[in-house]
């Protein structure tokens, strides 16, 4: 009798995606982040669902409903801390996943890469509307500042902002619709993840060498299920340590004060995972220019496949490109640091320099390094 998991219409899909999937034999721990992101999404949807059972999306009661969750709901404090820090884990895994894609040339799977970039943007949008929901000071002013950026769009800007606000300022209508968006977006993300996997399984996984792995494949289960389980265990450990011991380490103290439209916080800044983009936004003294640079900082990922000049796929055997990759990584750390600093000397000089370096490395230096490395491969005798 044939095995049920290979014949049953539903189980066959699961089997082909997670059990009998042929995987390259040499993929490293950098390939763990896809499954970790899937787990993060499940954790966020589940904790978010339980939070939504007790949360009220009204300006008068939103802040106190979050306090009520933490004080009066059974394990509400834990659910809230897991959800807030789960977002940080989500973005940590996302950045490492994208970094892996750039380092090993996975972006040459163009469909998978493009849907991945759209996923990144959607997750960022979800995190932004979610941050507004507790209705603290930084929630309110973050929403005001970021939505206001749309007013830089010529002609329709102001109308667009007021349409998104549902009035003439960030108020009750804004909070209600942001809650609706925050609830629906994770399910849209889940659908997009399935499409992401669908495209990936059309080609099969890339591997560290960047060579075609078809000659040496192993089944996903048990080899990579156990490997992913180790990664999962480590991520859950870090998440629990964060949620149990230092739940507010990555948050902003201003968000412990209820939203007050009459009192602006001294430093308006987003959560750590948006700081690099915020630094790029602030480094341009023109409003529209800043908004375009902010968009470009993420959308530049879409043109990376077009800028691939090397004969080799991976950076594994390309020392010049490797150096540039780690320079780019350091540059992103600098941008993250600058995004969290006040607008004063010397930070206002470092910001534009780091922003220029970011675009210069991706758009010019990396493609140039690929050409130089191609030339170095040619026999000279």
UniProtKB/Swiss-Prot annotation:
GO biological process, any: mitochondrial electron transport, ubiquinol to cytochrome c
GO MF annotations in UniProt: metal ion binding; ubiquinol-cytochrome-c reductase activity
Protein name: Cytochrome b
The species this protein was found in: Echymipera kalubu (Kalubu echymipera)
Residues reported to bind a ubiquinone: 201
Family annotation (InterPro entries): Cyt_b/b6_C, Cyt_b/b6_C_sf, Cyt_b/b6_N, Cytb/b6-like_sf, Cytochrome_b, Cytochrome_b_C_euk/bac, Cytochrome_b_N_euk/bac, Di-haem_cyt_TM
SUPFAM superfamilies in UniProt: a domain/subunit of cytochrome bc1 complex (Ubiquinol-cytochrome c reductase) (SSF81648), Transmembrane di-heme cytochromes (SSF81342)
Residues reported to bind heme b b562: 83, 182
PANTHER family membership: CYTOCHROME B (PTHR19271:SF16)
Family the entry assigns: Belongs to the cytochrome b family.
UniProt membrane topology term: Multi-pass membrane protein
